[in-house]
A protein has these predicted regions:
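The short loop immediately C-terminal to the conserved phospho-acceptor aspartate in CheY-like receiver
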Residues: 14, 57-58
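Active-site beta3 strand of CheY-like receiver
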Residues: 48-54
Length: 136
């Protein structure tokens, strides 16, 4: 699958992390949408129906968990989600998995780790892997 055909919604209140993710993912060819809090993230997700949601667990106005609970109950079904968090708790991770989170990445993290998780969730093959269509 070609990244240019995919939209990713970043929902995080940390400006530096959002801008780092945006720069790297736009350079990979993804279309990036940004929301700075849970309420905005929920509105953008419902309006745009992105291919992937990268969601911070702890944010103002509505936590990542509340966003997931709302999205899970919507008619369109769950958007594939990678949760990022500074929280270490195993109960949080277990609840995220119960809500259908595809990957759970602890802050701080290497951007390469996030990119690998995104590629895995979206089925994007890295360059050089068999079957990758490398147009010059």
């Amino acid at each position: 699958m070609n990244p240019q055909q995919r939209t990713i919604l970043l929902v995080d209140d940390d400006h530096e992390i959002v801008e780092s993710m945006r720069t790297i993912l736009e350079n990979k060819g993804y279309r990036i949408l940004v929301a700075r809090d849970g309420n905005s993230g929920l509105m953008v997700a419902e309006r745009e129906n992105p291919d992937l949601l990268i969601l911070d667990m702890m944010m103002p106005k509505k936590s990542g968990f509340l966003v997931l609970e709302k999205l899970r109950s919507r008619p369109g079904g769950m958007i594939p989600t990678i949760m990022i968090t500074g929280n270490e708790g195993s109960r949080h991770r277990a609840y995220a998995e119960m809500l259908g989170v595809r990957d759970y990445i602890r802050k701080p993290f290497a951007m390469e780790k996030l990119v690998r998780a995104i590629d895995k969730v979206l089925g994007v093959k890295p360059r050089g892997e068999a079957g990758f269509d490398d147009e010059g």
